[in-house]
Amino acid sequence: MTTETFFRTFTADTTAGSANQVLARFPAPVTRTGRVSYRLTRGGERYALLFANRIDSTFADGAISKANDAGGLWEIRAMRIGLAKEPGMPAGACQTVTFDGRPNRMVQAGEGFFCSDPVTLRAAPGDCLVYEVTIRGNDFPYHEEMVLNVHSGEHEPLPLDKRIPVPLMVGCDRPARKKIGFLGDSITQGIGTPCESYAHWVAKAAEALPDDVSVWNLGIGFGRASDAATNGLWLARAKTCDIVTVCFGVNDILRGRTAEEVLCDLITIVMALHEAGTRVLLLTIPPFDMEHDHQAHWYAANDAIRSGMVPADRILNVAPILGRSQPFSHRASFGGHPNVEGSLHLGHVAARYLNQMLIE
């Protein structure tokens, strides 16, 4: 199946964050098996998985990998998916996942999007899709800060270890009236809420959206506006959506970018999405207990966003939801990475904005 067919036919069916966050770098090729479960949002009959072999955003200080870095040559030796009722439970009848009819696939260094063939599962809402893959290679992408339990290793029983490639989308061919993407950093991804709780703000927003709307969580820990603005595969995924929420700025400021630079990056992102026909709900930079120069840039950037300097379709001011009362609105009331309570508040407000955009 071509990626054009994939994006035309399949939409995301989990609110778990999805990204190529960092490169695993083993000194020599290894054969590893990995397993992870995804809670399905809407359910459906046919599923397909999306992958790529490039990094989405710079990890930490960039010493390990940076945005758009290419993974090396590696092989998918086997892949299976099945259904379970709860995360961590063994799947029922697992099915082999194929690529153009073949059960294995060589992934080229730096390869862009590629996808699996469809698999029939007939999942109900709330079921878990169990993904299992065996690969061989030494330089491949994985998601270090995934808010799911990932088991991987060279021998059973597999230990908790996230170094295994995971899908960028768990796609279902259930029809969707509109596709909504959530582009952002660890706050969007869901860090701050318990592992496998699906209590992050994107999940809470999804619960308040119509059943015929799909939600794709494009949040990634350490995510930066400056990286999304490079117009790589990360932003390319967002461009396939009808509406995208954009929430950046914390990591940019903490890594030394000025308010002016953050605003320029946000303008670049919004304009690129508009050129693709995607409408944008822009969130102000969330509170993160910044101090000194960082605090000054936080206030300056947010003042400019609220004034309309970034040409988004709608603006959602996050500070009154997650921050303390003025003059301390830069301080987080629910943790820099919002906890369950903070995520619930933000999710409900975001859903109100999105539901309004759906009828405009």
Q: Across the structure, where does each feature detected by a protein language model lie?
A:
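N-terminal secretory targeting modules
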Residues: M1-L183, T188-Q189, T193-C195, L358-E360
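Conserved SGNH/GDSL esterase-like catalytic core that processes O-acyl groups on lipids
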Residues: A63, E154, R177-M271, D289-A300, ...
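Extracytoplasmic/cell-surface-exposed regions of Actinobacterial cell-envelope-associated
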Residues: G110-P141, M146, H155-K162, L209-N217, ...
